[in-house]
Amino acid sequence: MGLTFFISDVHLGELPPKKEKKRVELFVNFLREIENSADRIFFVGDLFDFWFEYKYVIPKKHFYILLQLSRLHDRGIEMHYLPGNHDFWLGDFFDHELGIKTYPEDWQGEIDGKKFYLFHGDGIARKDVGYRFLRRLLRFPLNLRLFRWLHPDIGIPFARFVSGSSRQYTNQLKLNDHKDYIAFAQKKFEEGYDYVIMGHRHRPFVHEENGRKYMNLGDWLENFSYGVFDGQELRIAYALKK
């Protein structure tokens, strides 16, 4: 029985070039290290700091990462991609070209007999009022169609600016306050889920009650944390020793 890995908030493309190169190398090395033990990998939002697909165009700067994801697919590793608040403009590239199943919002299912609920977590906090309005605006289908009319050399820089604005707004919130997330998870526990996994807060965190567990995956900007499930236990792990 192989392992299931859960990763969120890598935000590839956010840092200055030299720092970004080191972080990409770290992330790729991590993916190579787990390829012999992983049955499946869930990317729970914000793998990229920005992602947008036109009909014939994708951002070229992430080629090295995309190549590694293709390698994982070729090795038979099952992969799933949930959108975050920076990479929700997912088209069909990941599914058709890389064999990565994508989802519009959340994922619910069973792994080794346990019921999981996965969601990036953006918009849950009561303080996220402004973001919830922005989220509806950015995801409105007509706005997406209008945006695709822009040439990529104009549209992509503009979208990166919007992505940066979203990050600045999120950074102003109290990131270590998990009360709203715990309350959300408790409702899912009542629905019968054993594990609730989210990201977005950039703080690794675990809450347990009555044999059920809520986990926030942290990030790959400061914590380099991820979740791993071995069929018996769900735990937080770190790519770098703390």
For each of these PLM feature ranges, what is it?
Residues 9, 239-241:
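Conserved histidine-centered catalytic loops in small-molecule metabolism enzymes
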Residues 2-3, 7, 12-111, 222:
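Core catalytic region of metal-dependent phosphoesterases/phosphodiesterases
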Residues 27, 63-64, 94, 117, ...:
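A generic membrane alpha-helix/interface feature
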Residues 87-191:
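Conserved catalytic scaffold of divalent metal-dependent phosphoesterases
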